[in-house]
From Swiss-Prot:
This is DNA-directed RNA polymerase subunit beta'. Zn(2+) 1 binds at C73, C75, C88, C91. InterPro entries: DNA-dir_RpoC_beta_prime (IPR045867), DNA-dir_RpoC_beta_prime_bact (IPR012754), RNA_pol_asu (IPR000722), RNA_pol_N (IPR006592), RNA_pol_Rpb1_1 (IPR007080), RNA_pol_Rpb1_3 (IPR007066), RNA_pol_Rpb1_3_sf (IPR042102), RNA_pol_Rpb1_4 (IPR007083). The lineage of its organism: Bacteria, Pseudomonadati, Verrucomicrobiota, Methylacidiphilae, Methylacidiphilales. The RNAP catalytic core consists of 2 alpha, 1 beta, 1 beta' and 1 omega subunit. When a sigma factor is associated with the core the holoenzyme is formed, which can initiate transcription. It comes from Methylacidiphilum infernorum (isolate V4).
Amino acid sequence: MEAKNLTARQVLGFQKTIGFDEVRISIASPETIESWSKGEVRNPETINYRTFKPEKGGLFCERIFGPTKDWECACGKYKRIKYKGVICDRCGVEVTLSRVRRERMGHIKLAVPVSHIWFLKCMPSRLGLIMDMTAKDLERVIYYEDYLVVDPGKTPLRFKQLLSEQEYRDALAQYGEEAFVAKMGAEAVRDILKQIDLQALANDLTAAMEGTRSKQLKKKLAKRLKLVQGLINSETRPEWMILEVLPVIPPDLRPLVPLEGGRFATSDLNDLYRRVINRNNRLKNLLQLKTPDVIIRNEKRMLQEAVDALLDNGRHGRAVTGAGNRPLKSLSDMLQGKTGRFRMNLLGKRVDYSGRSVIVIGPELKLHQCGLPKKMALVLFEPFMIRRLRELGHVHTVRTAKKMIEKQDPLVWDVLEQVTAGHLVLLNRAPTLHRLSIQAFEPILIEGDAIRIHPLVCTAYNADFDGDQMAVHVPLSIEAQLEARLLMLAPLNIFSPSSGKPITTPTQDITLGCYYLTQPPLKIKVQEQKRKPLFSDAQEVIFAYNDGLLQMHDLILLKNPDYGRSTVFGDKNKKVIETTPGRVIFNQIWPPELGFYNKPAGKKQLGEIILKCYQTVGREKTVQCLDNLKELGFAEATKAGISIGIDDMIVPAEKTRIISKAYEMVNVVERQYRSGAITDGERYNKIVDIWTQATEEISGVIYKSLENNLGRPEYNPLFLMVDSGARGNRQQVRQLAGIRGLMAKPSGEIIERPIISNFREGLSVLEYFISTHGARKGLADTALKTADAGYLTRKLHDVAQDVVITMQDCGTNKGIIVQAIYEGDEEIVKLSERIYGRVCCDEIIDPMTGRIVVRPGELIDEKKAKEIEEAGAEKVKIRSVLTCESKWGVCASCYGLNLATNRMARLGESVGVIAAQSIGEPGTQLTMRTFHIGGTASQVFKQPQIRARNDGIVQYIDLRTVKTVDNHFIVLSKSGYLAVLDPSGRELERHTVIVGSIILIPDGEMVKKGQVFVQWDPYNVPILTEKGGIVEFRDIIEGVTVKKELDETTKQISTIVIEHKHDLHPQILILDENTREVIAFYGIPAGARIEVKPGDKVVAGQRIARTPRKMVQTKDITGGLPRVAELFEARKPKDSAEIAKIDGIVEDGGIIRGKRRILIRDPQTGSEEEHLIPLSKHLIVYKGDVVKKGQQLTEGPIVPQEILDVCGIQELQEYLLNEVQEVYRLQGVEINDKHIEIIIKQMLKKVKILDAGDTSFLWEEQVDRLKFEEENRIIEAKGGKPAVGIPVLLGITKASLDTDSFIAAASFQDTTRVLTEAATLGKVDPLKGFKENIIMGNLIPSGTGFRTYRNIRLVEVAPPEFKEEKKEQKIYGNGEEPAKEQKWIPQAGT
């Protein structure tokens, strides 16, 4: 057996397309344009109105563009293929295929040169840059308003000076016609461009850049130099930006189609070309006739405008319109936007052999099957049918086979069965938000018109059966079928790529059936039951149950099947377990390795069981279990017949008590407000909080009352549905049977009066009216936000599309440090969850036993992650894509597990696209969620206290505190934190505490687990005095810096600081009681309320003023999505915070130009930084505070770019990661960190050059980090001076447009700008990413198309075996590895 080096495609008889490795774009010279052309178009006519034949020399001329009929010249002298290539002597048309009319171009010779609008008007204007003129001046010249001095001669005129009509006449009169040359229009510009020596200009610019200090000038010179270098490198002359010859695109790309009634529909381009030709011909005639200059100039300007309109209509002046005032579509419009060439025809093609239909549920299907209507299959598999009919000898020609199929001969159906057996189809549901929206299934032919799908894949497709439609595609080639079977088959996609959790989890009826089956017995029944029968095995229980001797939820004793053996769920210590017949039946479908599951199994638990099942027994058995689970769930739900009635919505008895208590508390707050103890804002916040707590309390109580079901001897169906996760959620139940709660105004504010009623009791007219607000806004929001979410997904895709696994291990020892995430005192993300599936950087040792848990470079699986957590590790350093050092793409070790397959990521896996899908998909889903809750305010109530999570010793670290009368401590400093230590001094937990918090336990004392040891006022930010003394006011002047406010309701007067223009700075000074010198002073921000009077005596820790916290707004994803977009776009948030640039001590620098000057001095180095902060911003640090680099000095969100500048890359990465995760976490969406890390990596891949050294970079140029390091390495090796650069943070839109690939950038946004830039610089597209390869018609360089798998050696196998296998329709196993004979398949497929 000899091995031949053949590629898979050659073996299967595919023709190799002409391959190319890169694509270059540059500006065409007039000679090039003429070389493309087959002839000049002189006649503006299109076709003859009588004969409907193309006019000679016109826009559809057959002599230029080729014949309209195959193998036939225009006059009909030569017909048929035998005259191929003959040029007719009568009509001059070449005898050839009419298809050439799609590729042959013509040209128009312009009477005068014309500027190309892209190079003139696309900002920054390339013509303006190279000529060093402003775009405005250039326009005046090009549109024939001013003269441009091309050659000043001996006159005092300057080169490139603009002269108005009058100035030109005066100059002529003064110096004479021969003395100087000044011209108008594009001709003048062309003459100047012709004089430019690019190399000399480049040298001059470089010298000028080195010689200047001005940043402004340097920036401008760098831009010009970049353009000049680009032109030199691409061997382009600048005068080619001025057109002398205009190409005419092939006629079949701008067709003229006859409609009925003798009218014609034409492409707008024909109208635009006709205008150009008409004006050009008229100008030629006028030039020969010695016409007055004014007329000629006007005609030249009109020609310039006609060409502008053809190239980019609407960019200059008003757009040229056609019938009905519609702007005509120019060449640029055909490229850009959703309907342009890139997005419509190159990236989104219509697919042959596809169909779509409504979907219905197919409960009888197996997971790898789908039901395909016979009518659809007949059309989709037609070519296969024809081949099979001929093979079987039923027909001999294709035509008769087609007729047979059309007639639907009974024989056809049998053949159809044979053809479709084992031939997979792909099912897709729009919107295709992630890769699980297209999966492969084996078609089962069914009657009827609807496609049937398996209930368990609905979650992945997000499909329901209220009229959803799905598309079917047939993979045709052998490779496509193979990939469908080995990679896309539904049983292979059990896990979600975004979180690694099972996605084929049961929903709705299946969940309900299983949950009902595994319910514990009712308490009443248990009391009635006399004895618990004992059974020896499951079979006995099932017999007894089937014979009616047992009820499903009777309590029974069963001999423990897991006694003495370790299983996942079983209890190996008990000999007998207490269970119910229902649970015994439920356990029959799971493999015995899992053990006996003896708890109620709701949606969440079922997901857990599926995951454990996969980990224990592998995929094949799990898939069988899933199908059994589906059968069981449906059967039991049907038998149980669970349905809800109005009596099942039990309003809890405690509701009235809770509400009256809330009303009392509200009255107390109102009284406090009326007595002036609190402000209106505080009153509002307190009332909202009271009702939020009351609503939460009622929610808890409802659940209890539903579970008890008023003591009836049956399960409450509403409780079963919600508790199992089958239907509805807690909020909906609360609204049905509890309290509707607080509602939001359309502005997002919460209305402080809640809706007390629920739907069971019915709403009053007023309550109903209030609730319409939120419900309507929800619907409007959903419609608007879906588009935003889709756009975010698209931007993410574009930025991450070319991130692929390119190597196994890049060998770096860098990584990131991760730890568990806490919110308040609750652990919300465990350490084990964050490190699972990642590669460890450092050795981790169990401190108790000294055993090595994980070695460097080892993958942390679930078991290891648990062990690390149990070993008490707080922080773990793991490999991350953020620190990956692979040339392009990322390496498998830095990425870790592929969550969808639970295996290490493989070469060629497109992790970037998966990251984009994982982040974008929940965004789209979450916008739909508002729609279901119906406008009730979801308000997160935060406890204003900290509880200890462990027993330990409290330690104050860098905290400044003041002791109060009752032995508590008030926190005065912003920096520092509280720690809880174990007896050996190891830190167990740490908490940041806000200024004004009261610590209830002194430093060094013990705290018990669960004990509250810090409290604070949730409604105000206090300003506290650190020293005791006498109060004195400074710059607190009524009517200027403060106002006295009389509250109408409370009749109380309060002093409020107001915004003011004067150079005054309200401060409260504290004077020493004896010496009367100033010992402390506090700036009071606008909006604060002063609580002391001059001359008052205060003690340390007393509150002297307070600023109310902001009003409460609702939190939902609509607030979240814009936040995610803001983070990924790296926008500067409004009202952003100021952050400290160095470590040091805060000093007050007084007030300068209406801003507060803060100095931070580092006592070690003596360096200091100053910050100028607007007076309206509230400072959260005080004089003498110790601050760390990057710490906030004022309130507000932080600017990401500043974190990068001050703290460096790692802090920024951590900040972005945590901020994005927080938004998703709030919605209960799980996304693995690695996906967000990939996007952040792409945002940080550029470096800004500060000093180019001896490299070829330019000042302030943004270059790829790897390119930067590579170039530096080369220069350093030669002993030169390397470049210096700083990392920059780009928003995802900017990062997408800044890729190496101009094709990908052009297909994303700003098409004309991208192409203009690419053409002037002569860019080369290396075709590395996905989009550019799809556009060029190549396989994408990822997955099976990855370069490693492209050229695989095939081993020839003896033909008989191969054929034998082929006959049997089962070449490949059931979703597992393919048969052994074809050795090449596993490599190609995986």
